[in-house]
């Protein structure tokens, strides 16, 4: 029986353990604590999750920081490993892009691994050709 999915716009305490399970399987999020994750969620402007209605499980997630005018930055696009290849990555990103806090922004950006570039290019993202370099400083 095919699954049906529901979009949610918050991750409360009742679903936090499910987000932590998604985070546990990704290299960039696997060391986050519950407290750290709660603070991240609180500081995010947009939170989108996709739940499987059959078992009420969070199977896809993304979050955004935005000034609502010039820039929005998408973080933590994750699809559960057992649900990949079903269009959920595209669906969660589409939900982000259609969110009222994002859809009128001039430029939406994200980080991704090189192997995911074609996936994001199919959704209209492109690599900057302006010679811009990402700079980072740990505090």
Give names to the regions the model predicted.
Residues 80, 113:
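Residue-level recognition of the GNAT/N-acetyltransferase active site
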Residues 93, 100-112:
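Conserved GNAT acetyl-CoA-binding A-motif
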Residues 36-54, 59-78:
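A conserved beta-strand-loop-helix scaffold within acyl/acetyltransferase catalytic domains
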Residues 75, 82-84, 107, 119:
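Acidic/histidine-enriched, beta-strand-rich ligand/metal-binding domains
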Residues 1-34, 51, 131:
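Short amphipathic alpha-helix that is part of the acyltransferase structural core
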Residues 107-111, 121, 126-139:
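Conserved catalytic-core motifs of GNAT/GCN5-like acyltransferases
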Residues 83-92:
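Conserved acetyl-CoA pyrophosphate-binding loop and the N-cap/start of the following alpha-helix
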């Amino acid at each position: 029986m095919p699954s049906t999915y529901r979009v949610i716009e918050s991750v409360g305490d009742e679903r936090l353990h499910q987000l932590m399970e998604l985070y546990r399987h990704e290299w960039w999020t696997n060391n986050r604590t519950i407290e750290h994750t709660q603070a991240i969620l609180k500081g995010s402007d947009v939170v989108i999750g996709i739940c499987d209605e059959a078992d009420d499980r969070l199977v896809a997630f993304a979050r955004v920081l935005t000034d609502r005018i010039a820039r929005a930055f998408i973080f933590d696009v994750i699809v559960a490993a057992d649900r990949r290849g079903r269009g959920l990555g595209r669906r969660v990103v589409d939900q982000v892009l259609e969110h009222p806090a994002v859809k009128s922004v001039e430029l939406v950006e994200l980080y991704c691994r090189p192997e995911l570039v074609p996936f994001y290019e199919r959704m209209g993202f492109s690599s900057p050709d302006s010679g811009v370099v990402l700079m980072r400083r740990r505090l």
